[in-house]
Amino acid sequence: MAWTRRSSTPSPEGARIAERGSLSELGEFGLIARLTAGARVGPGVEVGVGDDAAVLTPTPGRKLVVTTDVLVEGRHFSAGLSAPADWGWKAVVVNCSDVAAMGALPRWLVLALTVPADTPVEVLDQVYAGIGEASRAFAVDLVGGDVSDGPALSLAVTALGEAERVVTRGGARPGDHLAVSGPLGAAAAGLALLR
């Protein structure tokens, strides 16, 4: 799997700016409806975005693998150095990567989004375009989450996956094959260069 985003060019989905409204004008439910329109919904999703909680049906006989990562503006991404679609892409793939590292197939995502009140809606359109692009690329479904206002933009993604056999960090045995998808330490080195 390639965990890097193919392009920093805004996708047509993220370019949808039908109306220019503020977050306060849209309200929480209006924002959720706007951002999740056209979201992928695959097998196993009984109830997804729009209700109090998601209802999922895992594949019988598989183990459920769960992880969460939080990306915070100024720490994990910067508005001046990368496109908002890249932030959404990264939020999905770092979680899918953790699930895959455990020998599981990523299936579902839940997103908790904190947004400063003065954030242009267009920025969130782009963030969700990146989330949508990554979700389709890795066949995972965004099934729920929460939106709140706060001092800095942050994306907390919880990914759920399924595995027949779980692979843990301490579970490697002589003769096992170890694989990496890119240069070790490259992400940290890149961030250090940008700072």
For the regions a protein language model found, what residue spans apply to each?
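Helix-biased detector of long, well-ordered alpha-helical tracts
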Residues: A2-R195
